[in-house]
Amino acid sequence: MSEDDYRQLQSALVIRPDMGDLIPGSGGLRKLRWRIPGRGKRGGVRVIYYWVMSREEIWMLLAYAKAKKEDLSPQQVKLLRRIVESWNNG
């Protein structure tokens, strides 16, 4: 993802921080499918982020190519949930 693509993603999330789907059992993590122009049908990325409503912040946790991986494993979701919990409590 280029810097310009990342800025476009950030701008979209500022406007609609709830645009990603909630990941069940994740404690509020969201998954967003983001298309990157010129890369074809499978050329986009999936972005995992957490929206901290009380602080009006969005924490970007993970981005990966759609062509490489469909969903996070339950273990990955659990680990990311623990990371967010530690940030919220720390």
Name what the model sees in each region.
Residues 42-47:
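Short, surface-exposed coil-to-beta transition loops
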Residues 1-31:
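N-terminal first-folded block
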Residues 15-19, 29, 37-39, 53-58, ...:
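Short, charged/polar surface micro-motifs in flexible loops or helix N-caps
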